[in-house]
Amino acid sequence: MATTPTINRNRRSNEALHPDRPWVRVVRVLLGLGTLAAVAWNIYRAATGLSESSVIESCSHFTNQANVVFGLVVLCGAVRSRKTLPSWWDDLRGAAAFYMVMTGLIYALLVAEPGELGRWDLDPANIMLHRVTPVAGLIGWLLITHTRKQGWGRPLAWLAFPLAYLIYTWV
């Protein structure tokens, strides 16, 4: 399966931030494992009664679902060569980054208690899932090179999961 070459925005930055570079892979593996560990910790806390949520409620949170998608996308992108990824990979990567940005914004604007955004004495999983991954998702999308140019219509497809989740929560 052939893919198109990466977009040459700036040759020097394109080579430095190529997803197949070893240091980019290491960062992505650590981020992916940290993200999935934070979600697993949330589910473990729910299963053992350490949180107010049940396991089903914890698995139903958009934050946890979006972070699982993001963690898997980051890990798969880290362990597989860019040339072996399918042509739709950038769309999935873009959707995961979009979900992370939405998670961060909704947390910051609607969910966090007043004054909580300035505190760092929170549960590490909370910090990872609501602060680190949203910022990392945005930075990764902006800086890691893409395999093809993105049309303006593609982000509309990324809305499918959040809209389905919204309908699910309303029903």
Where on the chain are the PLM-derived regions?
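Aromatic-rich, lipid-facing transmembrane alpha helices and their immediate juxtamembrane interface loops
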Residues: 2-171
